[in-house]
Swiss-Prot record:
GO biological process, one term: mitotic cell cycle
Organism (species): Pan troglodytes (Chimpanzee)
SMART domains in alphabetical order: BRCT
PANTHER family reported in the protein's UniProt record: MICROCEPHALIN (PTHR14625:SF3)
Gene from which this protein is expressed: MCPH1
Protein name: Microcephalin
Lineage, highest ranks first: Eukaryota, Metazoa, Chordata, Craniata, Vertebrata
Principal location listed in the UniProt entry: cytoplasm
SUBUNIT field: Interacts with CDC27 and maybe other components of the APC/C complex. Interacts with histone variant H2AX under DNA damage conditions.
Pfam families (UniProt xref): Microcephalin, PTCB-BRCT
Length: 835
């Protein structure tokens, strides 16, 4: 640490870039602290110095009003280099906005990331106030105990008991004291997350009231008042869990719109009841049947009636308009979908659906929405995977019930709680790992308007207006499920135009953007979804979907097609029809030549010419036009870039890291340069923190670069643009620098010095220091000639262990370095090496 030369200084630093987007205060704060000054985070009465540059006008006015010394960043640097307290009047701060009208408010938005500091009562005032307020409230409650009012409590078995107030208050205060003590020790946040609240409810026996079954009759559930009251008192008032209360109030609002659905209310209450029960994960086989006892007979018949009808595209388009409004109105999508009795449950946990944006499933969705739909469809398979693992077999009626229960349980949990860890891990599984999940089966008999709306809410509308392959649910079920369901001859078959099985549902989204995407690596197969040229007669054919890996390998492997660049021949896995009739050809015949670099930068491995024409998202044809349109925006972005990269480079040498950080920030702000580690052909400026003769300085001299001090950067930062270099050139320490720079400026072509042009051929020893390559480069840049073998040279530079000749001069490396520094050939007699 430097000497405390500024020990009496209390500084307030406000250093911004001229456009107000970059804050450079931290670097100068560090330098001031190293010199012994105190740096205040706020402008208080103890501040004696304000380091100011492009700061707030209010700071400037306050400093002038109080008579505080306003200095520039140059004062800090001068004090550091001189090692003494420099007079502040030599470096006054400048306020460029002083003469601007006061009505103009300059907005400042720092684009630099903030440092994360863990909040404690010591470093956070709001946290400290909250902590003190909580302690005062505890003290007030201790002094104002009312011992006269008894308390009535409900035990977990439903019995009513009498408890004196003293016991309740004492236990309550002891819990608060314990909580405060833990907070003091751990310094944790005062507001626990909902996952912490859930853990407390399991550990604390006083919260066991949540586990009490809500024995409310079915008739009572029909009224909204009883539903809201029972739900509120059980979860919000008794438990004191504000998180649960918020969820119930949301549910209460949604139930007001569906008064006629008795089963929905019962399902909600049962899901809430099971939510607090720790034994839910160990459900026996009889629980789904008991759960379904509340379903009406019509809805159970609706589950069992699996008809062969399909929902037409017109119905999908009509429902696509009202689908997003329906989801917005009824937030209870997991429960609603389960009460309708359909086996195509497209549900997610409530906590997950809140954090992930809903996407509309219309066929006119832009590409961004299609990418979101791809992720959401894969996530929707998760409940079915958990169901298959827990039960081990598929039950015809109990499937929706179990899924509804699992969704009901997780809909009130915190998304980041440990209970949902398994769920979130399962979302990342590739599609083929989810094949054992139960296939989505559906009934499409004549439905009412409300039932159709419920189905449309859960359906995928991405394939409206497209002809897709059909799936034999029976064959697929027989291969993936150990105990398949019993279906009739005509009932087991259904087209997948509306809803497909779980694996295909995850894979169908690959074709949404008008092209095929290869499946994850290692699968060895890919699905072909869209058939734009499929003949009309294939609409009614039911093609079995074979799930074996060997048959899937017959489909196109798109990744190998892209890498090899050969024509892909895709065969239909069931009918063996030719590619030219059904599938778009991905390999294009392009007349325009493209370089290897352009091909590598094209998206997805495609290459081709680019034409001016609109991008098409609906169909692919056999020409390369579709891919040209996809490639075009990427190439335009590549050509335009985010501003062209500067052609000249700047090199730093003999500079500590803190100075380097300042230089990098200033260069990034003022533009015009790019930072290079070593001097090269494009280098024009060499910044030297100390006047030391380094290789970069010598190379900069030999190439005719500016050799400047660090102050040039500081003054440029002060004035907001790159200023003239001449006052900051280190010509006193390196007299050759301005001479070589002038020669370089006057030279017509590429500059090459003439210092060693009259010298004989030289040989640089491999044992020389600096390294051979750098020393040879220096000699070559100064006009010298370097030989690779010593017998052709008349001058040998560096230590030489071979046989020495009398006619050859053996000189030290310093001869080359001193000659370049002084810009004259030094006398060789002073640099001879001992024979």
């Amino acid at each position: 640490m430097a000497a405390p030369i500024l020990k009496d200084v209390v500084a307030y630093v406000e250093v911004w870039s001229s456009n107000g987007t970059e804050n450079y205060s931290k670097t100068f704060t560090t330098q001031l602290v190293e010199m012994g000054a105190k740096v205040s985070k706020t402008f208080n009465k103890q501040v004696t110095h304000v380091i100011f540059k492009d700061g707030y006008q209010s700071t400037w006015d306050k400093a002038q009003k109080r008579g505080v010394k306003l200095v520039s960043v140059l004062w800090v640097e001068k004090c550091r280099t001189a090692g003494a307290h420099i007079d502040e009047s030599l470096f006054p701060a400048a306020n460029t906005n002083e003469h601007l009208p006061s009505l103009i408010k300059k907005k400042r938005k720092c684009m630099q990331p903030k440092d994360f500091n863990f909040k404690t009562p010591e470093n956070d005032k709001r946290f400290q106030k909250k902590f003190e307020k909580m302690a005062k409230e505890l003290q007030r409650q201790k002094t104002n105990l009312d011992d006269d009012v008894p308390i009535l409590l409900f035990e977990s078995n439903g019995s009513l008991i009498y408890t004196p107030t003293i016991e309740i208050n004492s236990s309550h205060h002891s819990a608060m004291e314990k909580r405060l003590q833990e907070m003091k020790e751990k310094r944790e946040n005062l507001s626990p997350t909902s996952s912490q609240m859930i853990q407390q409810s399991h550990d604390n026996p006083s919260n066991s009231l949540c586990e009490a079954p809500l024995n409310i009759s079915r008739d009572t559930l029909c009224s909204d008042e009883c539903f809201a009251g029972g739900l509120h008192s059980s979860f919000d008032d008794l438990c004191g869990n504000s998180g649960c209360g918020n969820q119930e109030r949301k549910l209460e609002g949604s139930i007001n719109d569906i008064k006629s659905d008795v089963c929905i209310s019962s399902l909600v209450l049962k899901a809430n009841n099971i939510h607090s029960s720790p034994s839910f994960t160990h459900l026996d086989k009889s629980s789904p049947q008991k759960f379904l006892s509340n379903l009406s007979k019509e809805e159970i018949n609706l589950q069992r009636n699996i008809a062969g009808k399909i929902v037409t595209p017109d119905q999908k388009q009509a429902a696509g308009v009202s689908q997003e409004t329906f989801e917005e109105k009824y937030r209870l999508s997991p429960t609603l979908s389960s009460t309708k009795g359909h086996l195509l449950i497209h549900s997610r946990p409530r906590s997950s659906s809140v954090k992930r944006k809903r996407v509309s499933h219309g066929s006119h969705s832009p590409p961004k929405e299609k990418c979101k739909r791809k992720r959401s469809i894969r996530r929707s398979i998760m409940p079915r995977l958990q169901l298959c693992r827990s039960e081990g077999r598929l039950q015809h009626v109990a499937g929706p019930a179990l899924e509804a229960l699992s969704c009901g349980e997780s809909s009130y949990d915190d998304y980041f709680s440990p209970d949902n860890l398994k769920e979130r891990n399962s979302e990342n599984l590739p599609p083929e790992s989810q094949l054992p999940s139960s296939p989505a089966q559906f009934s499409c008999r004549s439905l009412s308007k409300k039932e159709r709306t419920s189905i449309f809410e859960m359906s995928d509308f991405s394939c409206v207006g497209k002809k897709t392959r059909t799936v034999d649910i029976t064959n697929f079920t027989a291969k993936t499920i150990s105990s398949p369901q019993k279906t009739g001859n005509g009932e087991g078959r259904a087209t997948s135009s509306c809803v497909t099985s779980a694996p295909e549902e995850a894979l169908r989204c690959c074709g949404q953007a008008g092209k095929e995407d290869a499946c994850p690596e290692g699968n060895g197969f890919s699905y072909t979804i869209e058939d734009p040229a499929l003949p009309k007669g294939h609409d009614d054919d039911l093609t079995p979907l074979e799930g074996s890996l060997e048959e899937m390998k017959e489909a196109v492997d798109l990744k190998s097609t892209q890498n090899k660049g050969t024509t892909s021949k895709i065969s239909n896995s069931s009918e063996g029809e030719a590619q030219s009739e059904h599938e778009p050809c991905f390999i294009v015949d392009c007349n325009m030549e493209t370089s290897t670099e352009e091909k590598e930068n094209l998206p997805g491995g495609y290459s081709g010419s680019v034409k001016n024409r609109p991008t098409r998202h609906d169909v692919l044809d056999d020409s390369c036009d579709g891919f040209k349109d996809l490639i075009k925006p990427h190439e335009e972005l590549k050509k335009s870039g985010r501003g062209k990269k500067p052609t000249r480079t700047l090199v730093m040498t003999s500079m500590p890291s803190e100075k380097q950080n300042v230089v990098i920030q200033v260069v990034d702000k003022l533009k015009g340069f790019s930072i290079a580690p070593d001097v090269c052909e494009t280098t024009t400026h060499v910044l030297s923190g100390k006047p030391l003769r380094t290789l970069n300085v010598l190379l900069g001299i030999a190439r005719g670069c500016w050799v400047l001090s660090y102050d040039w950067v500081l003054w440029s930062l002060e004035l907001g643009h790159w200023i003239s270099e001449e006052p900051f050139e280190l010509s006193h320490h390196f007299p050759a620098a301005p001479l070589c720079r002038s020669e370089c400026h006057l030279s017509a072509g590429p500059y090459r010095g003439t210092l060693f042009a009259d010298q004989p051929v030289m040989f640089v020893s491999p044992a020389s220091s600096p390294p051979v390559a750098k020393l040879c480069e220096l000699v070559h840049l100064c006009g010298g000639r370097v030989s690779q073998v010593p017998r052709q040279a008349s001058i040998v530079i560096g230590p030489y262990s071979g046989k020495k000749k009398a006619t050859v001069k053996y000189l030290s490396e310093k001869w080359v370095l001193d000659s370049i520094t002084q810009h004259k050939v030094c006398a060789s007699e002073n640099y001879l090496l001992s024979q």
